[in-house]
């Protein structure tokens, strides 16, 4: 008896331990049953009883949870609910706290969805490190959808508004029904065989869970995962989530959002043109400064070398640099001109003609100024070279001969600068401006 008395429970303790046991062991469960005694007081909470042919359980679904239910429950309706067992200790009643509620048919699909989601996650199909980035410059989009649905109209409308230069290739497929998943897989495989697009957009409009069920196919999940092309999933409305959303590289909430994700605003492309012009100016300026430094260095070297040979070499290098500079400038201008023409073609449907005209005139003006500046600089450099060559020629021995002087050497080619070094009979060579004179010493006279 003593041991029994030591284990006497209070009512509160009993209800508390029962609550811990039930909540700890059962956790969250799915429960199928028929609604009865449904009530919705002003607090916004729902209270009901779920029953089958022989038993029943009280349930509660609080306001924050029941706002996500897409239908109004009624007595006699079969539903599938997900929740956790809890004990209401003041009365000793146990009840089910409902977190989500679906009609019985949709509830079975939801269970299958959760099971497949857990399986694919365990296989690594949802891992973040497997997601492929979108191409930076998307030129062609492959759209996998029904060619007659609302989704393709929304996608084409958004692309035409934001970036009409993007090409669209439609891979027609079923998007609802028993064979839809297989049809979508075939479309993805065809796109990967052709490799004619930069990215795939898998899309359709909204619908019920059953309508969108083909996008919860395990085979489709593996096809998306194995695709060599990046895949964007834009299925249903923002509240709809499918297995394809988890496997795809990027998920968009709606077809229109998917099209916006894959396109760029035309104003951004105009900004890129302005950036390209600025880079061209900086590159030309840098190249000009570099050539000026090279010219200065060559001038310095020229002063320490033979004038004619150095001048010839420098003139040749100057011509080469001029040709290379002009070629580089023309290539830059040609590339920029082609970019401008391409952007003008893409933007033509939106008629930004005024902006393109301004940018084109600005480009021509800058190119003209750059060409004039380079030509002026080259002319100045050429004048400095000619002046330096003239200065060197003025101090050249050859220039001295042209003024009537001569240079006399002996038979050993040594310069004779004094009569004291000569004897009668020595042979001499005298270099004049034009030619040489060979002579023999017959008489030596000292200066008086």
Curated annotation (Swiss-Prot):
Signal peptide: none
A GO biological-process term: DNA catabolic process
Protein localization: Cytoplasm
Recorded superkingdom: Bacteria
Database matches in CDD domains: ExoVII_LU_OBF
Cellular component GO terms, alphabetical: cytoplasm; exodeoxyribonuclease VII complex
GO MF annotation terms: exodeoxyribonuclease VII activity; nucleic acid binding
Keyword hit for Glycoprotein: no
InterPro entries to which the protein is assigned, alphabetical: Exonuc_VII_L, Exonuc_VII_lsu_C, OB-fold_nuc-bd_dom
EC number(s) recorded for this UniProt protein: 3.1.11.6
Chief location category: cytoplasm
Keywords attached to this entry: Cytoplasm, Exonuclease, Hydrolase, Nuclease
UniProt catalytic activity: Exonucleolytic cleavage in either 5'- to 3'- or 3'- to 5'-direction to yield nucleoside 5'-phosphates
Reported function: Bidirectionally degrades single-stranded DNA into large acid-insoluble oligonucleotides, which are then degraded further into small acid-soluble oligonucleotides.
Family membership noted in the UniProt record: Belongs to the XseA family.
Subunit structure: Heterooligomer composed of large and small subunits.
HAMAP family documented for this protein: Exonuc_7_L
PANTHER family: EXODEOXYRIBONUCLEASE 7 LARGE SUBUNIT
The name this protein goes by in its record: Exodeoxyribonuclease 7 large subunit
Provenance organism: Shewanella baltica (strain OS155 / ATCC BAA-1091)
């Amino acid at each position: 008896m003593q041991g029994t008395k030591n284990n006497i429970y209070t009512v509160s303790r009993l209800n508390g331990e029962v609550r811990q046991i039930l909540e700890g062991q059962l956790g969250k469960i799915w429960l199928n049953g028929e609604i009865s005694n449904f009530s919705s007081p002003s607090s916004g909470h729902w209270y009901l009883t779920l029953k089958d042919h022989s038993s029943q359980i009280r349930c509660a679904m609080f306001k924050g949870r029941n706002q996500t239910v897409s239908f109004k429950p009624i007595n006699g309706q079969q539903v599938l609910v997900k929740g956790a067992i809890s004990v209401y200790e003041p009365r000793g009643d146990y009840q089910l706290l409902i977190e989500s509620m679906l009609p019985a048919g949709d509830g079975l699909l939801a269970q299958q969805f959760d099971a497949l989601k857990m399986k694919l996650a365990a296989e690594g199909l949802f891992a973040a490190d497997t997601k492929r980035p979108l191409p930076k410059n998307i030129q062609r989009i492959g759209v996998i959808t029904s060619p007659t649905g609302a989704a393709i109209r929304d996608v084409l409308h958004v692309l035409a508004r934001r970036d009409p230069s993007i090409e669209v290739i439609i891979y027609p497929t079923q998007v609802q029904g028993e064979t839809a998943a297989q049809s979508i897989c075939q479309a993805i495989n065809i796109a990967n065989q052709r490799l004619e697009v930069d990215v795939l957009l898998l899309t359709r409009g909204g619908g019920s869970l059953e309508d969108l069920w083909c996008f919860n196919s395990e085979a489709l999940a593996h096809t998306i995962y194995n695709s060599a092309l990046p895949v964007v999933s834009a299925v249903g409305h923002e509240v709809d989530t499918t297995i394809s959303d988890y496997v795809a590289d990027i998920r968009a909430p709606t077809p229109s959002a998917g099209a916006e994700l894959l396109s760029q605003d035309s104003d951004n492309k105009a900004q890129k043109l302005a950036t390209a012009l600025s880079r061209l100016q900086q590159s030309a300026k840098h190249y000009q400064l570099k050539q000026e430094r090279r010219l200065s260095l060559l001038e310095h070297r020229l002063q320490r070398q033979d004038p004619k040979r150095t001048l010839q070499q420098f003139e040749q290098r100057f011509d080469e640099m001029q040709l290379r500079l002009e070629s580089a400038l023309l290539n830059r201008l040609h590339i920029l001109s082609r970019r401008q023409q391409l952007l003008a073609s893409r933007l033509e449907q939106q008629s930004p003609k005024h902006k393109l005209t301004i940018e084109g005139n600005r480009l021509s003006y800058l190119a003209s100024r750059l060409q004039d500046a380079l030509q002026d600089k080259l002319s100045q450099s050429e004048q400095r070279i000619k002046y330096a060559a003239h200065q060197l020629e003025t101090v050249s021995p050859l220039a001295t001969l042209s003024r009537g002087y001569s240079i006399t050497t002996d038979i050993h080619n040594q310069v004779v600068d004094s009569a004291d070094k000569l004897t009668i009979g020595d042979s001499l060579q005298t270099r004049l401006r034009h030619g040489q004179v060979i002579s023999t010493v017959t008489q030596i006279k000292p200066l008086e």
